[in-house]
Amino acid sequence: MKLSILFSAVLLGCSLTTQAQVNAADSVMSHAGGNRFSVGGYGEVALSRMFYSNNVYRYMDPGKYKKDPSHGEFSLPHVVVYLGYDFGKGWTMGSEIEFEHGGTGSAYEREYEEGGEWESEVEKGGEVELEQFWLQKSFWQGKLNVRVGHIVVPVGLNNAHHEPLNFFTVYRPEGENTIIPSTWHQTGISLWGRLPQWRYEVQFLAGLDALEFNREGWIHDGTKDPFEFEPANKYGVSARIDNYSLPGLRIGLSGYYGHSIDNTYVRNADGQESKLKGAIAFGSVDFTLDRWNWIVRGQADYGHLSDAYDIVNLGGRQSRTSPYSHDLVGKNAVAVGIEAGYDLFSQIQKLRADNQKFYIFGRYEYYNPYVRDKRQVAYEYTKKQRLAVGVNYYPLPQIVVKADYSHRFLKSPYDNEPSINLGVAYQGFFL
């Protein structure tokens, strides 16, 4: 059943037609004015009510928390500032500063891994990150570009097109956002370019850190590190190619490969880590259709992690004072999603002429970050299906007001997880 959903998403992407999106890695320098100095960005405000328990033990003893009251959250998921400069002679600089959930400070949180105890974090429930900072030299009118610095890793639909005007739901699509870093950004070297009807990119990166992997997020936290540098004992490579041959259709293929064990500070080259690799192989196919007043997007992702069974026993993971996860880690992960929306205002001449849009949409996704090794304990709650329906209203091309009803379906005896979400977002350049 799940394979049929995956292949249906792929086939649908190949049979439809869409307008090219700007790859997120190019956003910093995609302004229309052509100014040497550019300023832009995007931001999101989200208001949510969840009609299920937020107790950290709700998956361990679901019956006990079935009647817990609903809970609400108001947040700023992402606020981003772009800064770019064109030095001339093919040299450019791009940067992107991101404030997640309001920035940093001091906060408390509760985690199942910590036995549900309150844990102090040196953060304000959020982060301030330099998501991009790079220097680039372009050749042959952009057919080849060499970019060095901190760059977006465009693996999967969500990372390549993560700005809020590129998805219908109030929050980023859950599947990819769960199993891989999002937004995925690392320091490395990128070779990329545009040809007629094609865009390509290959990247050489520092490896991910297996000590940060966990059951509920697979390799999602693999880019985290507590140091002032990215450990690069091991390396990774990513690649992406997009095709725009058909009017209104973009089809993309992307992937990542790298080793993750013993990619931390200090190395333990003589211990168990020296015998293990933690090789990550991840592949994704995605598409976007923007034609005939429809927008349809879809993606199918699958990943494999070698030595997953042994990661839980790596040095540094089992100590009570360890900052790393104590979880089991799945050997595979999967995420499949598709969404479609129709612009009702396209049928009203006055609103169409005013460039206003009103999409009614639906989204379905299935994801599982913990496809286990047969020797590992089963945790059936990691298998989730999600259905979301809602609307997007664009009073201006750069601003969207969103509303959706989302419902996660979990296997019995776990409780389903419905929620209502409202949001507003902007995306654009000021200079």
Roles of regions detected by a PLM:
Residues 121-122, 176-177, 224-228, 326:
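Active-site rim elements
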Residues 1-5:
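Positively charged n-region of N-terminal signal peptides that target proteins for export
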Residues 52-54, 65-68, 118-123, 161, ...:
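Outer-membrane beta-barrel pore domains
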Residues 212, 218-264:
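Loop-centered beta-sheet repeat module
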Residues 182, 228-235, 275-279:
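Active-site glycine- and acidic-residue-rich loops that bind
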Residues 28-51, 69-210, 233-237, 242-250, ...:
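Outer membrane beta-barrel
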Residues 6-59:
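N-terminal periplasmic/intermembrane-space "pro-region" immediately following the signal or transit peptide
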